[in-house]
A protein has these predicted regions:
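Hydrophobic, aromatic-enriched alpha-helical segments typical of multi-pass transmembrane helices
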Residues: 1-243
Length: 243
C-alpha cells in the first residue's frame, strides 16, 4: 500500500517538475535565445549554439523528470493491478496500458536527451566539412526526435486508457470528483496527441501539454495516492465482511 502511494505521488510530482522546467525554458528564465534572423540552416544552428549549451541543463532535467515520471507510471500500473482480484477485468487493462505506457514514454524521453546531448557536446569537428556535418546532425536529431515523439504519443494514448481503467476499478473507493478528473485527464492526453498530429498552428499544443502534464496528471495521481492512503486494504475489508 505504501509503495502504491509513493508511486502515485512520484508520478504527480515528477510530471509537475518536468512541466515547471518547460516553463522556465519557455519564459527564458534561465537563458535567453538570440533574436531570430533570416539565416540558413547552418548559420541558424551556429547562431543559437551558445544558447543551446546554456539551456542544456534545464532541457535535460525537464526530459529526465518526465522519463522518471513515466517509469513511475509503469510501477503505478503494477501496484494498482496488484490491488485487484485475479478475476477483475481491469487488472489486465492496468497492467498492459500503464505498464507499457511507462516503458514507451521513458524510452522516448531518454531518446530526446541522448539525441540532443550529442549536438551539445560537439557541434562539429571543424575538419573541412562543417556545413555537411551540421546539416546531417540536424536531420539525424530530427529523425530521432520524430521517433521519440511517436513513442510518447503511444504512451499518452495508453496512459489515457489506463487512467480510465483505474477510474472504473477504484471509483467506489474514491471521491466522486476524482472520477471527473480521471476523464478530463484521459481526454486531455488524447487531445495532446491529436493536436500534435494535425499540426495545429500557434501555441495550443504547448499550453494543452502544460495543462495536462502540469495540472491534470499531478492532481489525478496525487489525489489517488492520498485517497487510497485513507482506505483499508481490500483484504482487510473482505476479512471484516466475513467476520
Amino acid at each position: 500500500m505504501r509503495i502504491l502511494r509513493w508511486l502515485a505521488w512520484s508520478v504527480g510530482v515528477l510530471f509537475l517538475i518536468g512541466t515547471a522546467l518547460q516553463l522556465v525554458e519557455y519564459f527564458n528564465l534561465w537563458a535567453t535565445p538570440p533574436p531570430l534572423a533570416p539565416l540558413n540552416m547552418v548559420e541558424q544552428r551556429l547562431a543559437v549554439q551558445d544558447y543551446r549549451i546554456a539551456i542544456w541543463p534545464i532541457f535535460a532535467l525537464n526530459n529526465f523528470a518526465f522519463a522518471l515520471g513515466f517509469i513511475a507510471v509503469a510501477g503505478l500500473g503494477l501496484a494498482l493491478a496488484a490491488r485487484l482480484g485475479s478475476g477483475d477485468s481491469q487488472r489486465i487493462v492496468l497492467l498492459t496500458s500503464l505498464g507499457i505506457a511507462g516503458v514507451l514514454g521513458a524510452v522516448g524521453q531518454f531518446m530526446v536527451i541522448g539525441a540532443a546531448q550529442v549536438t551539445i557536446d560537439l557541434a562539429y569537428c571543424d575538419c573541412g566539412f562543417k556545413n555537411e556535418e551540421i546539416v546531417s546532425q540536424i536531420w539525424g536529431q530530427m529523425l530521432i526526435e520524430g521517433a521519440a515523439t511517436w513513442l510518447i504519443n503511444a504512451a499518452s494514448v495508453l496512459a489515457a486508457i489506463g487512467i480510465v481503467g483505474a477510474d472504473i476499478a477504484f471509483r467506489r473507493r474514491m471521491p466522486a470528483a476524482w472520477d471527473i478528473v480521471s476523464w478530463l485527464t484521459a481526454i486531455g492526453l488524447i487531445a495532446t496527441v491529436v493536436v500534435g498530429f494535425i499540426n495545429v498552428e500557434g501555441e495550443l499544443g504547448f499550453w494543452l501539454q502544460v495543462l495536462v502534464a502540469g495540472i491534470l496528471v499531478p492532481v489525478w495521481a496525487i489525489w489517488l495516492g492520498a485517497s487510497l492512503r485513507a482506505n483499508p486494504e481490500p483484504g482487510a475489508e473482505a476479512g471484516t465482511a466475513v467476520a
